[in-house]
């Protein structure tokens, strides 16, 4: 297909999804328990993402064209004409996510990026929202008919369990995989992709605790404000965001006491929320139980959790204890936070240094924190795909500059991103054309 054909197809898919907006929202409320406003907002993000990639390829931004012209008179040896273009890698398998039934599922970022690159897509729909996936498939079918693109450009299988997922990754025609989900499931599929006779890239977005570092001056001047914001970010969507800020790190002292009190008060006001699936709720309950059983960890808030309902949980521990307990770095998917108390900046830097790979790391700082921040930012740059100052990570902007990945276990490929226009690069590979006539160039 040509770039113009692909762009028109992506735009038509967006139009067809919008045309089914009411039905998608209605079935989504029943399947996921998510509120209407959340589903409407996520649908807007999804169609905007499709149109963003259409605009991106219309100007050939994805081709990364580079041209070193021939130098036939160069001595001691002439240079041939050399041109580089990015080319599609082939069929891509995409796994729908449980927590974003639209933006990270059948028509989500992985699918949009792969189609924009020129790669056919096979989606494995998530069992948590088959009705939404069905409407999205209808939108794709209508867009295929309206634009005349090849009928095989989009295919979807709904559920089928682990057997279907593993078979998809093993299929010899699949050239790459996009995945958003748990560390356990993602690592199994990653290993399968690597064990193939012809290993393929597995772009997995897996687990992250997204730490916040509250530096001393900021803690003293606006600790209550930061604590309230943390509580809101921690419980947004029942904590079911991959960018949920699971730990806050700060120094011991009066500011810490006020921070803990404010966060506790704010979280106490949050009513239990319905989690997306029974499996996610059970995993959250197990994570809370494990946290209660960790030595040196004190519960500040311990909500009762029954069925699919999840109330906020808040724990605290010392940095010295956190540093000796690897289990405290394991993501608990849900509204659970840990306040980690360091005795001094050296210990705070030790926490930063000990972090596994993260999607995000956040600094809360004021003017008096600049010198301390300069010693911690170089550490965090090596730990995360996105660094924030004086904000909260649960909003992920879809734009050219966004990076949504990080070192393992945040993702399986720290040089890529699953959000933003650079996400298309996962499904392209560079090809150099030497002295090839223009008739054969992309």
Residue ranges and their predicted role:
Residues 1-80:
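N-terminal Rossmann-like NAD(P)+-binding subdomain of aldehyde/semialdehyde dehydrogenases
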Residues 307-310, 345-441:
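C-terminal core of ALDH-fold dehydrogenases
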Residues 99, 128, 161-163, 174, ...:
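Short, glycine-/Ser/Thr-/acidic-enriched flexible segments
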Residues 61-231, 253-256:
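Rossmann-like NAD(P) dinucleotide-binding subdomain of oxidoreductase/dehydrogenase enzymes
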Residues 9, 117-132, 153, 198-216, ...:
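Short loop-to-beta-strand entry elements in the cores of soluble alpha/beta enzymes
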Residues 228, 250-359, 371:
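NAD(P)-dependent aldehyde/semialdehyde dehydrogenase
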Residues 168-173, 216-222, 288-289, 312-313, ...:
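Short, surface-exposed amphipathic charged segments that create phosphate/polyanion-binding patches used
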